Regions:
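Catalytic machinery of carbohydrate-active enzymes
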Residues: 1-315
Length: 315
């Protein structure tokens, strides 16, 4: 696996994976850095290479491996279909192939027969002592809800005043874990952790490994169209997702997520949705599309999901 070091903990469960850490700010920076990266990876003598990113940087590597006769396949971005889905006029509103299945296609073209219908989820991670010490004052009889209220772009973020109503209600009978990072997000989340008894800021855990321990033991994750929903889905945690300027038809819904767990902004009122794959493009008048998602309906759905037996590890 070639990726940023922060993602290493995701692959800890696999004993036969070698994680190669990118140094994009150092020896792998820029075009010269890509050449260095190619030389380092070439020394590993891979028999098969899967480019699951298909962006400019990985395209350069694809070309270098290709002209050196390595067996390499890359991800299809479905650019033609995406353009038709995201354009504002004459939009063709039909679902693209989910990203997880497009990843499988890459491996299948390399000769590996992957079938997600027989997928096995990993079990919850063991909550290590260091993490337990930080959460040991929590009630043991409550179900755990993760809430990740932020996303990479504003077009995917549920209004914080409405999200606070969700937090306020759900924390009465459930333990809430808030997920966010960076000074701005933490400053917003700390308002809620200080205001409500059963709300904990997961940024206080101090490491991504500890956050994964909590995520894998949740009973429910509430997320935007963002990474935390995918991380929870990796552990078969139910995900209730809220969608703004993006849409599940774009192919980026959490793995095996149920349609009834996805709350979509009103397309009758805002027909340009989805405006892009990542929610960066905000058309004029579309700044508040997510206010069309009724937080009461989200609460009702969350309570329905939480009727299932408690999932998390007993502390």
């Amino acid at each position: 696996i070639v990726s940023k070091g922060i993602y290493r903990p995701i692959f800890i469960e696999f004993g036969n994976i070698h994680f190669f850490e990118l140094d994009l700010q150092g020896r792998h920076k820029g075009f010269k850095g890509l050449l260095s990266l190619f030389k380092e990876l070439k020394k590993l003598r891979p028999t098969h290479i899967a480019d699951l990113h298909s962006v400019l940087r990985s395209n350069v590597l694809y070309f270098l491996f290709k002209i050196n006769f390595f067996k390499i396949k890359r991800l299809s971005k479905q650019r033609g279909e995406r353009k038709k889905l995201f354009r504002s006029k004459n939009k063709i509103f039909k679902p693209l192939t989910p990203s997880q299945f497009r990843y499988c296609e890459v491996f299948n073209r390399l000769g590996f027969n992957l079938d997600l219908t027989s997928h096995e989820f990993p079990g919850p991670l063991n909550i290590e002592t260091e993490t337990q010490l930080k959460i040991n004052q929590m009630p043991t009889n409550m179900k755990w809800i993760g809430i990740a209220p932020f996303a990479s772009f504003n077009g995917k973020i549920y209004p914080l005043d409405l999200m606070q109503k969700l937090v306020s209600f759900l924390q009465r009978d459930h333990q809430i874990f808030l997920f966010g990072q960076g000074e701005y997000e933490v400053s917003k989340l700390e308002v809620w952790t200080n205001a409500y008894q059963n709300v904990f800021g997961s940024y206080n855990l101090g490491s991504f490994e500890s956050e994964l321990e909590i995520i894998s033991n949740l009973d429910l994750m509430i997320s935007m169209d963002s990474a935390n929903g995918h991380l929870a889905a990796n552990y078969n945690i139910p995900v209730v997702s809220l969608w703004g300027l993006t849409h599940p038809f774009g192919g980026f819904a959490p793995f095996l997520s149920k349609t009834k767990n996805m709350f979509i902004s009103d397309r009758e009122k805002y027909p340009k949705i989805p405006t892009s794959a990542y929610g960066k493009k905000i058309p004029k008048g579309y700044e508040e599309v997510m206010r069309t998602i009724d937080y009461n309906e989200v609460i009702v759905r969350c309570l329905k999901v939480l009727e299932k037996p408690k999932h998390h590890q007993s502390l």
